[in-house]
Amino acid sequence: MSAVLCRILSIALLVCAGAGVAAAEAKAVTNSIGMKLVRVEPGAFLMGQDGPAADYNVKKHAEKFDDADWDEKPAHRVTIRAAFSIGATEVTLAQYRQFQPKHAGGRGSDDDAVTGVSWNDALAFCEWLSKKEKRTYRLPTEAEWEYACRAGTTTLFHTGDALPESFHQWPADIGLRDRFFPEDKLPQEYRPKSARLSLRVAQTPANAWGLFEMHGNVSEWCADWYGPYEAGEQTDPLGRSDGDFRVIRGGSHSMQTRLLRSANRTAWLPETTSEKTGFRVVLGEWPRGKMLSPALPALNAQNVSQTIPKLQMPSPDMPFFSGPKPFVIIPPNSSGPLYSWHNHSPAIAECPNGDLLAVWYSCVDEAGTELNNLASRLRLGAGEWEPASPFWDGADINDHAPKLWWDGDRTLFHFARGQLENIVRTSTDNGATWTKAQAIQPMSEIGNGIIRTREGVIVMTQDTTSTSLTLSRDGGKTWTFTPITDKKLMHRSGSPARHAGIHAPIVQLADGRLMTIGRLNTEAEQAKFNMKTPASFSSDGGVTWTHEPTPFPAISSVQRAVLMRLRSDSVPGAPGPLLLCSFTDISANAKKPTGMDFPCEGGTLHGAGLFAALSFDEGKTWPVRRLITPGGAPHTVSGIDRGQFTLSATSAEPPGYLAATQTRDGRVQLISSKNHYVFNLAWLKQLPPAPKK
């Protein structure tokens, strides 16, 4: 669309909107705190958006905004039977401070939309205002919100199939603006990059019913629990009866235009806050519709056995190896909630019932709002992993890098990076159901592996430079961390206050110290450790650290290592050696690897790719080293993101994020970003045959 045509369209929309606003003004009322509310008459509309599915390829066409998200389908007819009055604007800072005088959220002007309020805060405001005026104030239902937003339109926005010129704000490089739009000029619907951010309400034209900022400014909480749409006509829908997330609508400043569409849905934890999220209120009784039951559980949570098995313990002296077998099983060309393009950053845990549960994130773009968390279950006694199915996801939230941990008793833990916080959930029924998410700080990707020390402290590393570890001393009920306040110590290459590297797995050594290994991305960082993987040690619970290089090559992007304590294969219940799994070369060198020497029958072999090493002296030496491969003649195997690699006696999987657990049968369950390997200590110690010449 040309700039001239866009300008003509904008003028036409302003003229039409002006007529609608004039009609709405006659129906508006102002309440006791100066809030203008507009009466919305009953009616019907088409909720959601059908049509071509979004491909989410923001690197290719970040300006594209017209395709539908999977959770906006099917579009369905909704009838609103009763009139209601809704705020002409979002609740302002001045209005909210009559309820909470010390509230700090917002830009500071009385006419700014209030932000930094949780769904629970918004509900409390409505209850306060209801009591004050002896009338029912509440949040809009999701259906009421979209009905009011559309104001009789069926287009992508209430302004038509595009936003007017300079309607939307993205004035700072937050939300990856300059990654999506590296040029100085933004698409026509955005204000210039030089424009100053303003959260003032009523700064863009109202829709035909007199409502301002239904697209952008700040996003808005709705009353409903988030859940999938159902086909068929609905009357006064109230959403689901329960869920993990509350609905958020309208989009905010500093995000892609597609997230501002009338049909677009966002959802997140009701107790959390964001400086991009506020709310508007409805005056009127609750609709007389019915709530839908929660959606049926996904495949990974269906028919989960609750029996604690009597496991057959294989001989620890008999070498065992199996794999690789894919655990990421997704139909080709899937575009939500499962994605065929990028499946990465997995975690794995044994469940009390003997099942294996794997989780990972799935997306097109790793930074995209479409990113979802999926899971697959390998049921006890089954030979194959089940197809992937949704696990947990806040709509349009990049809830990144899930982790799993079993406490060895009844409880599974699920961790993830959220919007502005990390989250933790627990399950005591083998992952069939989970608690509501608990928000914890700091917000950061969690390292690769969670442990419980001999003192009973649950410990996990953090990728952020503002701390090193997050700890729980009460079994996961509460979490603490020691902040790093000296900026000179805030760097990922290691400091006296922080372990070296990111995605760091952690173990406790026999003398009580903590040990991590980490990934350093740049050559300059790697050079500090002689191009080797760094190890870090703490004798005071992660407050201070020392560092040294390991004997193993540095790894880089698309790679993550494992470090874990195995159980003894000779003394039941006793601690065994340390296991390290990593790669011989950085992923960029996968096609021309340097490789390493490995012991084999009659001497050594030179190989490259995924390997394992054992230390029997708490990380001082690593005498056992073996490529993780079944050997045999070279053949092609699928790896991460539809890539392929050659598997042979001297060649193993080259990149991937590794995760591992040792199951009660003594076997190590190792996964990459695509594949599942199983082996035991006896196999690791066994010398492989010399390669055939």
Say what each PLM segment does.
Residues M1-L9:
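Bacterial N-terminal signal peptides that target proteins for export
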Residues A22-A28:
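Boundary at the C-terminal end of the N-terminal hydrophobic targeting segment
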Residues D236-R240, T266-T273, E601, S648-A649:
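Short proline/glycine-enriched turn/loop segments at secondary-structure junctions
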Residues E275-R288:
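Short, structured beta-strand segments at or near domain termini in extracellular proteins/domains
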